[in-house]
């Protein structure tokens, strides 16, 4: 993986400036983000803006993300992703190279952003996720930080109508997933994925809960939050 410090700084500055001009971004509980050490940042995904927000908000120089290879077709987008050392991922089949690069980044103390849902939700509510995030947390032995983002659904379009959308980015506390038992690996990865998604959902409005609306773990987290 190649690093381009100057290009990264330029990209972060320009994108940060554009976002501040086009939208009002409210950041909540950023102090939950460690200033050192590797961890996985997991977000809900309703817009291409979601991973960009994570990149410009977290105050570290080693933040990057997994990005679908289909976006390589856009020369400008490819240049931006390469500038921030993004990891290109083939979502159509197992991508051993991307997984290895992601694990090395995390084990070397870097920060990796990923959307467990794997693709954008068209209506803003949570959709069935994939187990990739839970798998990465398992093989890299790093904690997970859930992030809930609201306001980006159609937010870019509203921005260009001179209506600055209100975007909220809320960072949850880091947590560690339980080890995966090899004898029931698939089931454990699903359970760990549900844990990630329920922690994200617990920070989202009810209208965003989607497929997790009736999940027992989400209800448990919401009750605990009410008591605190």
Describe each model-derived feature in a short phrase:
Residues 20-28, 150-153:
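Short gly/ser/thr-rich secondary-structure transition/capping motifs
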């Amino acid at each position: 993986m190649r690093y381009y410090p100057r290009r990264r700084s330029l990209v972060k500055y320009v994108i940060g400036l554009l976002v501040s001009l086009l939208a009002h971004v409210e950041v909540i509980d950023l102090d939950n983000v460690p200033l050192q050490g590797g961890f996985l940042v997991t977000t809900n995904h309703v817009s291409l803006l979601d991973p960009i927000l994570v990149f410009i908000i977290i105050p570290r120089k080693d933040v990057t993300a997994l990005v679908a290879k289909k976006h390589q077709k856009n020369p400008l987008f490819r240049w931006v992703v390469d500038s921030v050392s993004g990891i290109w991922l083939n979502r159509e089949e197992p991508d051993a190279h991307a997984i290895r690069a992601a694990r090395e980044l995390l084990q070397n103390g870097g920060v990796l952003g990923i959307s467990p849902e794997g693709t954008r939700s068209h209506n803003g509510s949570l959709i069935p996720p994939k187990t990739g995030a839970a798998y990465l947390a398992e093989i890299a032995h790093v904690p997970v930080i859930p992030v809930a983002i609201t306001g980006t659904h159609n937010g870019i379009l509203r921005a260009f109508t001179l209506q600055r959308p209100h975007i909220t980015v809320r960072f949850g506390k880091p947590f560690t997933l339980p080890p995966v038992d090899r004898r029931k690996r698939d089931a454990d990865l699903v359970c760990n994925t549900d844990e990630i998604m329920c922690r994200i959902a617990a920070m989202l409005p009810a209208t965003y809960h989607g497929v997790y609306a009736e999940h027992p773990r989400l209800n448990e987290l919401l009750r605990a939050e009410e008591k605190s």
